[in-house]
């Protein structure tokens, strides 16, 4: 394993630990999830370029699109929670009703 792969894997697990540790506020959880998705994007891009798998070259782009959609939905939830409750605690997510 190259040092770049080790660093990216470590970045993924540090972001995962951030999700588990800082799960009280939605903003910090969303930032850690974005870190996880970006490290997965870079690892997947490096894996595809290293093994010359041209058949799955669209996979990193699809992952990036889903990451952007996840960020948009998360920020919409953050705005809705902030306007309703005045804070961004994750425990308020189960209180949101249509």
Swiss-Prot record:
GO cellular component: mitochondrial inner membrane; respiratory chain complex I
Main location class: mitochondrion
Subcellular location: Mitochondrion inner membrane
An annotated Gene Ontology molecular function: NADH dehydrogenase (ubiquinone) activity
Topology within the bilayer: Multi-pass membrane protein
Reactions catalysed: a ubiquinone + NADH + 5 H(+)(in) = a ubiquinol + NAD(+) + 4 H(+)(out)
Keywords: Electron transport, Membrane, Mitochondrion, Mitochondrion inner membrane, NAD, Respiratory chain, Translocase, Transmembrane, Transmembrane helix, Transport, Ubiquinone
GO biological process: ATP synthesis coupled electron transport
Signal peptide interval: none
EC numbers on record: 7.1.1.2
Domain of life according to the entry: Eukaryota
Pfam families: Oxidored_q2 (PF00420)
Chain ranges passing through the membrane: 1-21, 28-48, 59-79
Keyword Protease: no
Tagged with keyword Calcium: no
Subunit structure: Core subunit of respiratory chain NADH dehydrogenase (Complex I) which is composed of 45 different subunits.
Family: Belongs to the complex I subunit 4L family.
UniProt function note: Core subunit of the mitochondrial membrane respiratory chain NADH dehydrogenase (Complex I) which catalyzes electron transfer from NADH through the respiratory chain, using ubiquinone as an electron acceptor. Part of the enzyme membrane arm which is embedded in the lipid bilayer and involved in proton translocation.
Protein name: NADH-ubiquinone oxidoreductase chain 4L
Biological source species: Tarsipes rostratus (Honey possum)
């Amino acid at each position: 394993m190259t040092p770049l792969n080790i660093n990216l894997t470590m970045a993924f697990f540090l972001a995962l630990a951030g999700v588990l540790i800082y799960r009280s506020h939605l903003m910090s959880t969303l930032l850690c999830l974005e870190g996880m998705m970006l490290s997965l994007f870079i690892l997947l891009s490096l894996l595809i370029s290293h093994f010359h798998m041209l058949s799955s070259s669209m996979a990193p782009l699809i992952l990036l699109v889903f990451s952007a959609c996840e960020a948009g939905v998360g920020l919409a939830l953050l705005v809705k929670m902030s306007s309703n409750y005045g804070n961004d605690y994750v425990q308020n997510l189960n209180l949101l009703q249509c």
